[in-house]
UniProtKB/Swiss-Prot annotation:
This is Trp operon repressor homolog. It is found in: Cytoplasm. GO terms for biological process: negative regulation of DNA-templated transcription. The lineage of its organism: Bacteria, Pseudomonadati, Pseudomonadota, Gammaproteobacteria, Pasteurellales. The gene is trpR. One of its GO terms (cellular component) is cytoplasm. Pfam families: Trp_repressor (PF01371).
Amino acid sequence: MYISRNMEQWNEFLDLMRKAFEQGKEQELLTLLLTADERDAVALRVQIVSQLLDKSLAQREIQQILNTSAATITRGSNMIKIMPPEFMDWVKQQLNHNNKNELGGD
């Protein structure tokens, strides 16, 4: 699986992200590093992954609901297929937990 052209830079980024989250500065760091459009794209990818893992809608329906392209949905679907199943189970648990919290559960 392709992760980055420069693993050293990628690992430095991950270390910086870990420190930001540990110190409660994730919002500021991501605002510094990502444009508003990039932040929106990441948030959209989370919604795509959530919908794909939920398996209650066809990809075309997800595309229409999220107002995005078929290619964007396909990229999300393809990444899900190559990730370890245990990791995807964890992601699904996290997304389900977040959705319950948003709906007033937990």
